[in-house]
């Protein structure tokens, strides 16, 4: 009998240890102090989630009174295709309490997220559109299916978009802003990427609808939590419009590895939205960056006009496809144009071709695989364990 009691106590102790959530990826120079993302276990009900938030609020207020903390507590809640999470500013004692809740899967620091663009090169030629519609290099004609993404909506998760730019006339609306109160593109990056994925002149999917989702400031930075909040809004908006299977997200941004960021884009993809992301610009393995390292989404590395890997482009086995990213001419706020380089410029090429495929009846789940199947095996020195496939739209040219 005594032995049974000992075993019972031992098993209870194991269960208690297993119940504790883990803290994912502590530390780093990009951590936002005292700001955290808390991810719940799968299957947590709305009632359990609300109860947890209430308990956390009470614990936070108690610890705040004890220690004189200025942390603001819970901020935003997320529900992306059943993936429940929230963010907030908490002291260490409150985080310890959260980690001990058996409904919590993991906690991670909120981190700075930045653009994946590099340099401006004035008066550079437009070459990317011609390249993605021809097997051989050097042709400037853009050949594409006449549907051109019609009926598909692309969400530009970025610095905002100049919705008055002629490139987007009659096809664009403002969506949401998770970073500030300025519903403009004070940086220009988001307008440029939108011009590439769906601009009338510089775009791939010239008839697609566009939604501006601002998650990065005019300075080009934001937070993981702000990006997740933007993705959450996108999924909710797509559902409300009965547009699953007819929508795409472009994320020309990134930061250090974040499981929460990866989970968010994965759930968006699984919900029925094609997601294209930038590989990053550090000439390193993209598996160490997010959302580039999420296996479920389509990760784009950058190529040059000579079909070389761009010197800055991240690489690695997580990369799905190369696309034009060096010296890309596209739209700029105020009705003009500018030339930028980066994997930020590669991703919207992929997003635009993906949107065009959706318009032709290819399913969300099939798009990235289809791009890899028909891509041109032409990239020289693509990087260790990296595909040499260059984006191609299947025009037959």
UniProtKB/Swiss-Prot annotation:
Which superkingdom is the protein from?
Answer: Eukaryota
**Propeptide residue range(s):** 20-116
Q: Which GO terms describe its molecular function?
A: serine-type endopeptidase activity
Give the subcellular location.
Secreted
The signal peptide stretch is: 1-19
InterPro entries xref list: PCSK9_ProteinaseK-like, Peptidase_S8/S53_dom, Peptidase_S8/S53_dom_sf, Peptidase_S8_Ser-AS, Peptidase_S8_subtilisin-like, Peptidase_S8_subtilisin-rel, S8pro/Inhibitor_I9, S8pro/Inhibitor_I9_sf
Similarity field: Belongs to the peptidase S8 family.
**What's the protein name?**
Subtilisin-like protease 3
Instruction: Tell me which species this is from.
Output: Trichophyton tonsurans
Query: What is this protein's gene name?
Result: SUB3
